[in-house]
Amino acid sequence: MSTNAELFDRACRSIPGGVNSPVRAFRSVGGTPRFIQRAQGPYVWDAEGKQYIDYVGSWGPAILGHAHPEVVRAVQEAAVHGLSFGAPTEAEVELAEMLIARLPSLEQVRLVSSGTEATMTAIRLARGATGRHKIIKFEGCYHGHSDSLLVKAGSGLLTFGNPSSAGVPPEFVAHTLTLEFNNLAVVDAAFSQHGAEIACVIVEPVAGNMNLIKPAEGFLAGLRELCTRHGAVLIFDEVMTGFRIGPQGVQGLTGVRPDLTTLAKVIGGGMPVGAFGGRADLMTHIAPLGGVYQAGTLSGNPVAVAAGLATMRLIGEPGFYERLSAQTARLAQGLQERARAAGVPFSADAIGGMFGLYFGDRVPASFAEVSACDTEAFKRFFHAMLERGIHFAPSAFEAGFVSATHDDAVIDATLEAAEQVFATLRA
């Protein structure tokens, strides 16, 4: 049996950095990544056979817990009939109809294979429909790794301390205006100066890629009003929050309706599915109806769609989100209480099945505030919890995720470990 260290050494010889997505490399926390061999419910097991309570959840998709039997069965049954057709299927129509039925802002939807594809195409669609070039995004919000969006971004870029990517020519981002999240005044000023040139505003309505940051009161409604007034397209990037924090995402909780929405993660149930959709008059600009081109060999893949359909059915059951939210809140509150009892500067927040942990005196509301949190304290906390079998994201700038299988016993075990760790941090 290979150890995690042996596997990482082997991986580094064939894969850049030893990983296929940067944050997995443990670079911001130090140490050796855990190579996961299997997962079930709220647990993962590494290459050395050690079991962990998992709060990464594949970075959001595992809302039902890992390897849910009904999702696995759906994938197996679909795979028997063929892995990919490159042609329309009834299942993809059913998934599209299900998404439209659940999100009031969706009138039509196009399936893709990732969140990056969804956001990249939504931006292209907004530009094509409006005939404008400039876009507004926000510091610390991550919308995938397309060139025009890799400016002061969150997720792995923020984790490694360089929120803008090398290899992106300045002219590619010349039309990208990057503003402070939760600051409506700067958005108003940008529209006052460039209103006739702005194609869209794209925002994580609850930011989950600079840890977890909720929108300030009136921020999303203000974006809606400004976009409507200036004829710009409002895009909610709900790749992470869509069906993760509630049955209608952030737009359901706030009542703010975007023009376009991007989705991924939960809607694929752990398989590669993304989507973008919204107003029908905008969606008619997409090929083959209009001149905005988008295509994908594996878009609407039948096996991935089967996983998505099974997941969407299960999360639609009565009481699902009430239970999920209660467990997530219990975790966040329990961590906060134990840190306070130990005298450790620490805050926690939660919404739906997402939570944020911050080594600071208050819950941050912006990129600047989350960047000021104590990352060294987080590193010590992360490794001490990992030693005790609790698997959090290996970054101080990523949200955490609770699944439907994180029951009271799992939460209690996590809080017991945290109580021990906070005592060592105080010392």
Swiss-Prot record:
Entry annotated with the keyword Isomerase: yes
So what does this thing catalyse? (S)-4-amino-5-oxopentanoate = 5-aminolevulinate
Q: In the UniProt record, does the keyword Nucleus occur?
A: no
**Which keywords has UniProt assigned to this entry?**
Cytoplasm, Isomerase, Porphyrin biosynthesis, Pyridoxal phosphate
Cited NCBIfam families: hemL, PRK00062.1
Belongs to which family? Answer: Belongs to the class-III pyridoxal-phosphate-dependent aminotransferase family. HemL subfamily.
Mind telling me what this protein is named?
Glutamate-1-semialdehyde 2,1-aminomutase
Species, as recorded: Bordetella pertussis (strain Tohama I / ATCC BAA-589 / NCTC 13251)
Q: Which gene is the coding source of this polypeptide chain?
A: hemL
